[in-house]
Swiss-Prot record:
Keyword Oxidoreductase: no
Described purpose of this protein according to its UniProt entry: Catalyzes the attachment of alanine to tRNA(Ala) in a two-step reaction: alanine is first activated by ATP to form Ala-AMP and then transferred to the acceptor end of tRNA(Ala). Also edits incorrectly charged Ser-tRNA(Ala) and Gly-tRNA(Ala) via its editing domain.
Cofactor detail note: Binds 1 zinc ion per subunit.
Pfam families the UniProt entry points to: DHHA1 (PF02272), tRNA-synt_2c (PF01411), tRNA_SAD (PF07973)
Keyword Acetylation applies: no
Protein's gene: alaS
Gene Ontology molecular functions: alanine-tRNA ligase activity; aminoacyl-tRNA deacylase activity; ATP binding; tRNA binding; zinc ion binding
Compartment annotation: Cytoplasm
Recorded family membership: Belongs to the class-II aminoacyl-tRNA synthetase family.
Name used for this protein in its record: Alanine--tRNA ligase
Lineage, opening ranks: Bacteria, Pseudomonadati, Pseudomonadota, Gammaproteobacteria, Enterobacterales
Alphabetical keyword list: Aminoacyl-tRNA synthetase, ATP-binding, Cytoplasm, Ligase, Metal-binding, Nucleotide-binding, Protein biosynthesis, RNA-binding, tRNA-binding, Zinc
């Protein structure tokens, strides 16, 4: 009996654990140590700094099953996913790693034992082929003499990519740094499948499939190309879980393994599809894996960077669901089946299931509103296309108006053998960006052009007043030697107490003073390593080299400090109340308010807002010490310090702790103790985007001001109701009850008036061939009363055709009623349409009742006068 995918994963980890390897959990799909990577795409990513010698672990052997995504950037498999046997946006990479421990001999022997051992994978040895780098005689001899593979199944691969060491069998991290030869293991599916061994002209066939790549990091490549042996060679291996599962389960396509069969059946169930061989099922089964795990790792759909890649994958899946005939939102329903089939690897996803489902559902609902119209436009454009290429302008219009990522458009076109002019699409995108820049209305931002060679030393943690020297001056972005009174400028000092805007905290304000001059600072910004003071010289003259006294606005800084410290407390409180999925997505810390954007799928309940508020105020009352420590980044993370997603940190970081409640990396300015904050109040909670909520709050004096304002409003209301704040609830309830009674009485009077009006109108009906026709314009009648009157009149008149109209604030309201015995000759919908057209409107409804509106009240008398002739003709 073949192993399940989950059992294969566990067997791999168990095998290497038995060989002294530390089992290390999969890292996030969002790399936390490599800004050059969009997503984690290999098992070695989380160990990159270990291989580079920048990080040390307490183990020298490791094994992982690493979640990986390849979609976007250099590794973009998206367009092939679902159409080939082995392309995926998401896959798991099984790996074993040696950090200066074992090398080629053990790495090869471990691989062979796992693959062929009777207690492990038990693959037939004669089905396995290997490749080695052309000059790697050591690996060749291990395979031939120690493992015993015949020479004809060991293939040397040279530099087949056009340059020295550019080979399928030579791995390098970059132009310089660790590199080395690799050996790859292939499985022969048999001669019933087309394809040749690696290195042959038929190597792209599906017969011989690479299942394991073992990299031997033994050199350090120098800038001049020289290869220096590493003092401690290492090993990095990777085996695709889905590929080895296909081999062990005796299938040729990854989509036929148990994991994908289960997901494909789930997709068919939620979309209503019956043909399990449909490639759209494969696309969706793949895409739910990448989308669900990306959301679980903190990525949300957006129009930029990782969020845009996620959006593209979701929308591609939704479009394929549409092709399968899905009539309602379906994609989020696959998260549950995915969790089940992933086994132990899905535990983190299970913890965040509700959040992930909500994000996927919201994104699908948004796209569903425009998908049908966008596809109709694309069909229309393709139908009239003369050549075989869709122009970039149309592809851009689909993106801009209907939210179609260009690869989704390309997907549709591909099915019809049509290409997309992607260069034209990019040109249209750039033109839109240019127009947006020109239309921003802010003119040129000269300060953004400032380049400062010197550095400024920030001393504002300990000082609010400091003497410094002017090292540079800028006016309209250009360096100058001096400025005069009235000029706006940017002043750079050698040292300053002014905090430059960063980490969400606004820049300081204050004054720079000296011999005969005063410079008012309205903002402080960073320019590389320099700190610029933006403002206006109000008196005197200032030149480079002048000595200045820098004075920060102390009261303003104090308010900012309170708000910043409260932001940290609120972040920790949100994670306690809502869950650990809460992550900071943006913030503003000013002297007046703090604003905090965070990941959460639904509006906070009033009880949750109160709980967060109470929790923060409880920490304020504890008067916790607020302490800062400078330490290594890894030590800070080990201490549990929260790092902001996407933020780049130096090797040495500033860790801010508030007792046992909050620990974060932060370079901002803060209170000394939580008690300094005084009071914390949330003033609003709202949504800014799918899955992103925003809280605005105030502290200290600002919070007290909101308390006073609320108290004043309550007193004003109490005064109006002739009560006091103590019995205000009873007073309001009494007023509401009295209002309901009066509204009920008023409606009764209106009904009576309408009934009386109906009785008066019935006598005005005229007889047309045995059918009573009543046409009337009514004054002082609410439009919603017309329907009641028509029902009353139909009961009174028997066989009848009725048209009533009223004009309120210049707008015409019309209604037509026809008794059921007359609807075979006169249709209310047709009648009301004829009248509405004459008063500048339109309408419709059932044969016995129809309503309409119009804008031309002056034309109403003539329109009503035309009814009798129209009805008479119908009754002939």
């Amino acid at each position: 009996m073949s192993k399940s995918t989950a059992e294969i994963r566990q067997a791999f980890l168990d095998f290497f654990h038995s060989k002294g390897h530390q089992v290390v959990a999969s890292s996030s799909l969002v790399p936390n140590n490599d800004p050059t990577l969009l997503f984690t795409n290999a098992g070695m990513n989380q160990f990159k700094d270990v291989f580079l010698g920048l990080d040390k672990r307490n183990y020298s052997r490791a094994t992982t099953s690493q979640r990986c995504v390849r979609a976007g950037g250099k590794h973009n498999d998206l367009e092939n996913v679902g159409y080939t046997a082995r392309h995926h946006t998401f896959f798991e990479m099984l790996g074993n790693f040696s950090f200066g421990d074992y090398f080629k001999h053990d790495a090869i022997q471990f691989a062979w034992e796992l693959l062929t051992g009777e207690n492990w994978f038990a693959l037939p040895k004669e089905r396995l082929w290997v490749t080695v780098y052309e000059t790697d005689d050591e690996a060749y001899e291990i395979w031939e003499k120690e493992v015993g593979i015949p020479r004809e199944r060991i293939i040397r691969i040279g530099d087949n990519k056009g340059a020295p060491y550019a080979s399928d069998n030579f791995w390098q991290m970059g132009d310089t740094g660790p590199c080395g030869p690799c050996t790859e293991i292939f499985y022969d599916h048999g001669d019933h499948i087309w394809g040749g061994p690696p290195g042959s002209p038929e190597e792209d066939g599906d017969r011989y499939i690479e299942i394991w790549n073992i990299v031997f990091m033994q050199f350090n490549r120098q800038a001049d190309g020289a290869m220096e042996p590493l003092p401690k060679p290492s090993v990095d291996t990777g085996m695709g879980l889905e590929r080895i599962a296909a081999v062990l389960q005796h299938v040729n396509s990854n989509y036929d393994i148990d994991l994908f069969r289960t997901l494909i059946e789930a997709v068919a169930k939620v979309t209503g599809a019956t043909d399990l061989g449909n490639k759209s099922l494969r696309v969706i089964a793949d895409h739910i894996r990448s989308c669900a795990f990306l959301v679980a790792d903190g990525v949300l759909p957006s129009n930029e960077n990782r969020g845009y890649v996620l959006r593209r994958i979701i929308r591609r899946a939704v479009r394929h669901g549409n092709m399968l005939g899905a009539k309602e939102t379906f994609f989020y329903k696959l998260v549950g089946p995915l969790i089940e089939v992933m086994g132990s690897a899905g535990e983190e996803l299970k913890r965040q299931q509700a959040q992930v489902e909500q994000v996927l559902k919201t994104e699908e609902e948004q796209f569903a509103r425009t998908l049908e119209r966008g596809l109709a436009l694309l069909d229309e454009e393709l139908a009239k296309l003369q050549g075989d290429t869709l122009d970039g302008e149309t592809a851009f219009r689909l993106y801009d108006t209907y939210g179609f990522p260009v690869d989704l458009t390309a997907d549709v076109c591909r099915e019809r053998n049509i290409k997309v002019d992607e260069a034209g699409f990019e040109a249209a995108m750039e033109e839109q960006r240019r127009r947006a820049r020109e239309a921003s209305g802010f003119g040129a931002d000269y300060n953004a052009m400032i380049r400062v060679d010197s550095a400024s030393e920030f001393k504002g943690y300990d000082h609010l007043e400091l003497n410094g020297k002017v090292t540079a001056l800028f006016v309209d972005g250009k360096a100058v030697e001096a400025i005069n009174a009235g000029q706006e400028a940017v002043v750079v000092l050698d040292q300053t107490p002014f905090y430059a805007e960063s980490g969400g905290q606004v820049g300081d304000k204050g004054e720079l003073k000296g011999a005969g001059f005063t410079f008012s600072v309205d903002d402080t910004q960073k320019y590389g390593q320099a700190i610029g003071h933006l403002g206006k010289l109000s008196a005197g003259a200032l030149k480079v080299g002048d000595a200045v006294q820098a004075d920060v606005d102390e009261a303003r800084r104090a308010r900012i400090r309170l708000n910043h410290s409260a932001t940290h407390l609120m972040h920790a409180a949100l994670r306690q109340v809502l869950g650990t999925h809460v992550a900071q997505k943006g913030s503003l810390v000013s002297d007046k308010v703090l604003r905090f954007d965070f990941s959460h799928n639904e509006a906070m309940k009033p009880s949750e807002i109160r709980e967060v508020e109470d929790l923060v105020n409880a920490q304020i009352r504890r008067n916790l010490p607020i302490e800062t420590n400078i330490m290594d980044l890894d030590a800070a993370k080990a201490k549990g310090a929260m790092a902001l997603f996407g933020e780049k940190y130096d090797e040495r970081v500033r860790v801010l702790s508030m007792g046992d409640f909050s620990t974060e990396l932060c370079g901002g300015t803060h209170a000394s103790r939580t008690g300094d904050i005084g009071l914390f109040r949330i003033i609003s909670e709202s949504g800014t985007a799918a899955g992103i909520r925003r809280i605005e709050a105030v502290t200290g004096e600002g919070a007290m001001a909101t308390v006073h304002a609320q108290s004043d409003r309550l007193n004003d209301i109490a005064h109006l109701l002739k009560g006091d704040s103590q019995n205000l609830g009873d007073k309001v309830r009494a007023v509401l009850e009295r209002t309901r009674q009066l509204e009920k009485e008023l409606q009764q009077l209106k009904d009576q008036a309408a009934a009386q009006e109906s009785a008066n109108l019935s006598s005005k009906a005229v007889d047309l061939n045995g059918v009573k026709l009543l046409v009337s314009e009514l004054a002082g009648i609410e439009p919603k009363m017309l329907r009641t009157m028509v029902d009353d009149l139909k009961n009174q008149l028997g066989s009848t055709v009725i048209v009533l109209a009223t004009v309120v604030e210049g707008k015409v309201s019309l209604i037509a009623g026809v008794s059921k015995d007359v609807t075979d000759r006169v249709k209310a919908g047709e009648l009301i349409g004829m009248v509405a057209q004459q008063v500048g409107g339109k309408g419709g409804g059932r044969p016995d009742m129809a309503q309409a509106g119009g804008t031309d009240a002056a034309a109403l008398p003539a329109a009503l006068a035309s009814v009798q002739g129209w009805v008479s003709a119908k009754l002939q």
